[in-house]
């Protein structure tokens, strides 16, 4: 009895291992999606790109002076963290987060005058929050991430269905997984590459376009939470394909032994 149970469990260990990987992926991708949605450290520290004023820039003293003239002391040290759905603004050791589509709470507060033309008294303003929102709205899109989370849950449930003994239709579910697992790996591979390119572009273009006034830092935590699930998806896809052919060979050998 014990040996039979041990062999039963051992045969299902690869699928159980894949279930664990998919379970981890659901949480990693969900945390990645919810990054910067609240001011708690767990979520606000999960960001794609963080923007702040470059203290070594020659314009930094003007920025500090401009904020001081508006009685916004400490705003020269402002930093804006961008996520898939929201932004978090850090000012004077306080964090406030808002949806990237509704930044009315920050309107006309973070804009700073950096240059004034004496001939017509016009000024050039720089709003670091609006810039971060533009990056988040126009370049970063959560749709692939959301689709990947949904498909991961479906794949997890279908693999769990196969592991449970006594259920019918496992042959069809196995073929379904044979298609879904590689598709999911390719889909999130595309999403991971898009996030990587978007983060690199958001850093490089903003720093150069602002002539070094703004500094951008890529979120290492978000990068790790992007590429780790992709690695797990590849492992699961290889495992699903390998188990399919293993089970197929066992069926062929069983049929040949009866002939």
Task: Give a label for each model feature.
Residues 29-32, 43-137:
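A surface-exposed beta-alpha-beta supersecondary segment
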Residues 14-24, 137-154, 173-183, 187, ...:
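Physicochemical signature of membrane-embedded alpha-helices that form the seven-helix bundle of GPCRs
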Residues 30-53, 196-205, 245:
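Juxtamembrane interfacial secondary-structure elements that flank transmembrane helices
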Residues 169-259:
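Alpha-helical transmembrane segments forming the membrane-embedded cores
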Residues 7-21, 67, 79, 152-177:
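Cytoplasmic juxtamembrane interface segments
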Residues 22-36, 155-163, 188-195, 233-243:
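Membrane-embedded alpha-helices of multi-pass membrane proteins, especially ion channels
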Residues 5-10, 126-144, 209-224:
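Juxtamembrane membrane-interface segments at transmembrane-helix boundaries in membrane proteins
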Residues 2-40:
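Hydrophobic secretory-pathway targeting helix
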């Amino acid at each position: 009895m014990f040996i039979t149970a041990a062999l039963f469990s051992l045969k299902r260990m690869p699928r159980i291992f894949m279930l664990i990987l998919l379970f981890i992926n659901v949480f990693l991708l969900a945390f990645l999606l919810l990054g910067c949605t609240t001011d708690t450290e767990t979520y606000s520290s999960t960001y794609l790109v963080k923007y702040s004023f470059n203290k070594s820039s020659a314009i930094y003293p003007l920025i500090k002076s401009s904020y001081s003239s508006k009685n916004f002391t400490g705003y020269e040290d402002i930093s804006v963290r961008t996520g898939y759905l929201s932004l978090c603004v850090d000012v004077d050791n306080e964090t406030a987060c808002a949806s990237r589509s509704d930044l009315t709470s920050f309107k006309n507060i973070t804009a700073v005058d950096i240059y004034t033309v004496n001939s017509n008294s016009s000024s050039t303003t720089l709003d670091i929050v609006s810039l971060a929102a533009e990056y988040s709205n126009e370049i970063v899109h959560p749709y692939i991430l959301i689709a990947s989370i949904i498909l991961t849950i479906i794949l997890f449930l279908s693999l769990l269905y196969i592991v449970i003994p006594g259920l019918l239709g496992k042959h069809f579910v196995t073929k379904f997984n044979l298609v879904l697992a590689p598709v999911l790996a390719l889909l999130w591979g595309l999403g991971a590459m898009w996030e990587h390119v978007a983060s690199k572009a958001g850093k490089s273009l903003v720093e150069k376009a602002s002539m070094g006034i703004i500094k951008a830092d890529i979120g290492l935590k978000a990068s790790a939470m992007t590429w780790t699930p992709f690695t797990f998806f590849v492992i699961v896809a290889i495992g699903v394909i390998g188990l399919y052919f293993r089970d197929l060979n066992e069926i062929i050998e069983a049929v040949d032994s009866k002939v």
